[in-house]
A protein has these predicted regions:
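Alpha-helical transmembrane segments of multi-pass membrane proteins predominantly involved
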Residues: 1-110
Length: 110
């Protein structure tokens, strides 16, 4: 079995790559993909923690290992909503500005 530390290191590397892309890239699509990468890094950490510290079965019919999976499900729902709204905003910005560069997009002037 792979130790928890390896999963957390991989999650931290993915999250750091997402933060670096978010801070240094200028294309809105790339920034959007970096945000999704950060959310997936958090999902990996949730699954790793849930698998490592699952808890004990108390007879209630709920598997304690599923707690991390439930959090991941909610994060995926939020990510899907964020993707829908984000892509709609990106399309609207591209139609009005004809660019996806965040330096050239100034929403205060037409």
């Amino acid at each position: 079995m792979v130790p928890l530390f390896y999963y957390l290191v991989l999650s931290a590397i993915l999250f750091a790559c997402g933060v670096a892309g978010f801070l240094f890239k200028r294309n809105i699509i790339t920034i959007f993909m970096c945000i999704e990468l950060m959310l997936n890094a958090v999902n990996l950490a949730f699954i790793a923690f849930a698998t490592h510290w699952g808890g004990t079965y108390n007879g209630s019919g709920v598997n304690p290992y599923l707690s991390g999976h439930v959090f991941v499900f909610f994060v995926m729902v939020v990510a899907a909503a964020e993707a829908a709204v984000g892509l709609a905003i990106i399309i609207a910005v591209f139609r009005t500005r004809a660019t996806l560069n965040v330096d050239r997009v100034n929403l205060l002037k037409l």
